[in-house]
Swiss-Prot record:
The lineage of its organism: Eukaryota, Metazoa, Chordata, Craniata, Vertebrata. Its main location: secreted. It is found in: Secreted. This is Beta-defensin 9. Belongs to the beta-defensin family. Residues 1-24 form the signal peptide. Gene3D superfamilies: Antimicrobial Peptide, Beta-defensin 2, Chain A. It comes from Mus musculus (Mouse). Has antibacterial activity. Weakly expressed in adult and neonatal brain.
Length: 67
């Protein structure tokens, strides 16, 4: 019984450890999507740029030049 509990605890710790890695993969895909649209990721968009999306979780905005 002790071995089973230990094994279950190890499995839970492994799965909880891999969760942040999935979030960083999502962030990379958001950044790639922004760059493919010709934008850039930044905290604020400049006055001559508009927000076209998000680069979550690293940056809150994907900005693009209006020109």
């Amino acid at each position: 019984m002790r071995t089973l509990c230990s094994l279950l605890l190890i499995c839970c710790l492994l799965f909880s450890y891999t969760t942040p890695a999935a979030n960083s993969i999502i962030g990379v895909s958001e950044m790639e999507r922004c760059h493919k649209k010709g934008g850039y990721c930044y905290f604020y968009c400049f006055s001559s740029h508009k927000k076209i999306g998000s680069c979550f979780p690293e940056w809150p905005r994907c900005c693009k030049n209006i020109k």
